[in-house]
Amino acid sequence: MQIVGYLSADSQSNPDLKSENEAKEEKPIGRRHTMSPVPATSENKYFGKSPLSGSRKPRRSRSLHKERSYMRKFFDMDMEESKDFENDQSLLVTLKVSTSLGQKIENILHPKLSNDTNSTAFPPAKSSGEASDTNILVENINSQETVNSSPLVSELHYSNLADSPSNLRNTVTSMHPFFMSKSVKKNSEIKFVSEERGGTKPERLLDPLWPTPDSQSMLEYAGSIEPSVFWFPKKHLEEAILEETSHLSFKEVLSSTTANMITPLAEKNKTEVLQVTPSKLHTFALESLCFSPAPFIQKVLSRLLPSDPNVEMPMIPQILEKGLWVSKYAPSKTQDCCAFSQCLSKIADWLRSCRLTKPESSSVPPSSSISRSSTIHSCTSSKRNEDSLSESDFEPDIIEEEDDSDEFNPSVSRKKAKLTSSQFSNWMLVTGVTGIGKTSCLYAICRELNFEVVEIHPGMRRSGKELLERIGELTQSHIVDKSRLNNTPDILILLEEVDILFQDDRGFWQAVSTLIEKSKRPVVMTCNETDFLPSAFLQEDHIVQFQSISSALLTDYISSVLYADRCIISRNVVESISYRYGSDLRGILMQLNFWSLVNFPSLPSKDKQDDSHEPFIEATISAFDEGVGVYNPRIQTSEDLLQTYSEEQMGDIGLLFMPNLVNWRKVCVPKSEMEEKEAIMEKLIYSHQYADSLSYVDYRFSSQPTIYETYELMNDSASFEDMSLECRDNCANAFQDNLVGFPTISNPFHANAPPEPHELKLQYHSFCFINNLFSKSSLKAISSNDSIVPKALNNRELQLSALASTIGYKLDPDDVYNILSFLSFANSQVTSYTPPNSIDRPNDILILEVAPFVRCMRRYDRIRLNSYKLLLSSKGRSASHISRRGAASILRSAGYNYGRLQYLEGSDRILSTWFSTTLD
């Protein structure tokens, strides 16, 4: 038989049996194991827990208890909600049971009426099958409904679409409402109300028949969710769905952040658009210059108004040209370069001497080789100094060809031009600070002299092998056609930033030396500093030092660029920007380019004609004030700092002209009209120190400097005894040497001396702040609404260590050379002192210079020892047949004595006198 209906575990919903059920005791239904009856109390009603505290339930009972709790979660409801969930389809349960089991279930659910209706409700099973049991069940329940007015059993309906008993036979699976689709739930309207379980003996039920995968389906909800489907409150469901589907927009994030900001956003500086003619703008630009315009300034201003009056006005499209200013205003000729003329002329003369040209003398036969320029004179003296350098090894082998119409001339020979040692120079080193214009000037000179540049920059792989493969073939001999000699450009090899080498650039300098030695092309190297270059390349005749031009001339050039791009700014602002960036012309142009794109609107080309038929162009004037957005080093007093800091609260130049952006730093600027000046100054100092300390500690604390030296540098009266115990322990650990049993060897140079002014690259306020900030226990509140900033660290030594990483002594290549200079003495040279022992040298020299060679010697000795041992065992008989004396004689003949063999036998003995086993 099959029972389909709604189950409810709430027996109190039946008013007829409420009085009778209160006096009864609940009998838990066990599955395969019986449980002792538990009295039905208010706490453990229906599926109550055992009242015995401390008693451990068996595993089967615990699992049954969990299952009961789970069922209670879904089927227990209050009295008020019972009416609302009377027609709830989520409680639909379909069970397929036998006739005898159905009688037992009916006796459990209806113990009062079981004696009267047992014979009529559930007759004995017939042999006709399961359909007869189902029909009898439905008929008896319907007939019982008319006799019995109790709402124990409500009306039954068939759960299939055909509403016929025959279709119930096809339902062979038990369906839990969780695995049923929505359509099945809507068509199912059967109600079956459970009642208090009766009987004195717990009944044993079979294991539930779980649905198969074929009969399962996902719950699908329509656009609107029906509250009757879910047993839990609707409010929690809406919150859960909102958390999954809702996302804060970007505007909401910005608005919430802006609302929490203490500092109000400044109003955006409005730009004023003017209609002006190019001639008036050009005149205004000339009047703003401090000096008479230099050639490179005239080149920039020619974009506004051409210098030749006969030239028409095609300059308007060039003014509207888009792109980076560093490319837009890049020089195209030597006179357009913003640099000293001496440096430019030296490079240009050198490139002219390296250029391949035809011989100027007509007496030279046609078959002779093409020589260098006329600036190089051939040496007429037949006598040469033996120590002089032979240029024939470096001069290119050039094979000349006749015209294509001529026949092959066997007289075409390979000749080599002869140069003196002073005239030979096929490489040059150009130095200068970053952004001064080294590369742009080189490209301008090469473009003017018809040179093609082959550039190798740090972004490329520059190992020795790859460098020779890339440009090695380019530097070898080549064939030049006479008819195409003037039209063929020469080639210049440019090695950019040779002072910046990475780990993958192994063998770079060896490849450069080979390249210069065998190259037939001129080679130019650029660098920012010469401290890390080999000494062989630091020859004064081959170095061109780029120096910055005067600040007034640089200001004129920047102002001309701004006027050429139709941006009108006061000269004082340009001076402050140039003072901030120094000689970095590229950084100035990039910063102003970004600022102009943010602050100035895109100006369309609106041409208007006046009486003179001269077109109008639009220019903008910005309220760019001095000292805003850039650091002004001329600030000396606290009042100046307060005034400047209040103006610089928006940060850099880009943030200054984008006030609509959120100031993520949340700088607190107190209101001057509500507080006194001293209170404002105190809060400003704390805020400034706190912001500076965070950035400084984050940047500098990654290193591991020595604290003791820092104390000596910062305080002359400080000593090792004045330090705290923890600080002294850290100092001892910092001074722990890699040598076993030896303290740190003090550096004989200026490590313990106070730093020079040029070595201390710290701002004044940061230097003063480091001395006194971390001695304070905490910082005060810096905002008006009592918002506390994070407390500063109490560890003063922490910040002093960060300071030592900047001002600490760094190993200099000259110091290494001076220490190891005695190794370069000739054998015939007699010294008046004994060479120092390696243990007396600085620790860095021992680790970096001596240890690799010792390891190499040890490796080589062990390889030789293994080879001789293999040789002893391969002479037709095994090594065990050779006597010890014979083996010792063979090894002794190879140079191995007894002490050396003992030294090499132990793998940990080597270097144990110098290093620990962990550092070996």
From Swiss-Prot:
Location of the region described as Disordered in the Swiss-Prot/TrEMBL record: 1-65, 112-131, 357-411
Residue ranges of coiled coil: none
Cysteines joined through disulfide linkages: none
Any one GO MF annotation of this record: DNA clamp unloader activity
Biased composition (Low complexity): 361-382
Pfam families: AAA
The keyword Repeat is assigned to this record: no
Subcellular location: Nucleus; Chromosome, Telomere
GO cellular component: chromatin; chromosome, telomeric region; cytosol; Elg1 RFC-like complex; nuclear DNA replication factor C complex; nucleus
One of the protein's GO biological processes: DNA recombination
Acidic residues bias: start-end ranges: 388-407
Key words, A-Z: Cell cycle, Chromosome, DNA damage, DNA recombination, DNA repair, DNA replication, Nucleus, Telomere
Bias-annotated ranges (Basic and acidic residues): 17-29
Family: Belongs to the ELG1 family.
Function field: Involved in the negative control of telomere length and in telomeric silencing through a replication-mediated pathway. May have a role in Okazaki fragment maturation. Required for S-phase progression. An RFC-like complex (elg1-RFC) is formed where elg1 replaces rfc1 in the RFC complex. This complex appears to have a role in DNA replication, replication fork re-start, recombination and repair.
Subunit structure: Heteropentamer of elg1, rfc2, rfc3, rfc4 and rfc5 forming the elg1-RFC complex.
Name the record gives this protein: Telomere length regulation protein elg1
Lineage of producing organism: Eukaryota, Fungi, Dikarya, Ascomycota, Taphrinomycotina
Gene from which the chain derives: elg1
